[in-house]
Amino acid sequence: MIVAVVLSAGESSRMGRAKALLPIEGQTFIERIVGALKQGGIERIIVVLGFNAEEIRRQIVGLPVEILVNTQYKLGQLSSLQVALRHLDADKSCAGTMVHLVDHPYIDPKLVKLMVQRFDESAYSIVVPRHQGKRGHPVIFSRKLFGALLGAPMDQGAKAVVNAHRDATLEIDAEDAGITLDIDTPELYRQHVKGD
């Protein structure tokens, strides 16, 4: 089983408000992401919160997710992923994790399904989508790499693990540019969301 981990612990300093709660197409970013993951066949979803955790938790109380809180969120995204990996370590049914970022709301359920299928059918340890040569999110990491992710340098993040395992990485071409769209400023939000 692939468990999705949505990283939503940052301070959103450039955006000025919690990205998880930003409206998009009648939902919030986090609702849209969780819905797409569910439609893509992901049964178990963990959301890692940090800054403003209680405020966000109150707003997403009805979502079918497990909530973890990273009290060390200032260390960066990798620290939030590590909180989830430690939580999953004892769950032997977890074959890997699909990591997604809350500021990437344009996630395609068909791509989610395809990525899991390709992961299950292959011996690759990492599955990453690519649009016009540029990699995006979500990214699947095999359980075999949990140790490497837990030991990766904080300043390099999960990219250090991807770079160290290039031969074990499968890239999947994605038609949707949304996989690379990181909406982390008010300007990008107005351009890509409010201008839908």
Located regions from the model:
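Conserved alpha/beta core of the MobA/IspD/sugar-nucleotide pyrophosphorylase nucleotidyltransferase superfamily
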Residues: 1, 153-196
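N-terminal glycine-rich phosphate-binding loop and ensuing alpha1 helix
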Residues: 1-57
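Conserved beta-strand segments of alpha/beta enzyme cores
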Residues: 20, 66, 125, 168-170, ...
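Short aromatic/basic micro-patch
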Residues: 23, 106, 139-140, 171, ...
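Hydrophobic residues at beta-strand termini and immediately following loops
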Residues: 24, 68-70, 129, 172, ...
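Conserved N-terminal catalytic core of the sugar/cofactor nucleotidyltransferase
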Residues: 32-96
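Conserved beta-loop-beta/alpha segment of the NTase-like Rossmann-fold superfamily
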Residues: 74-148
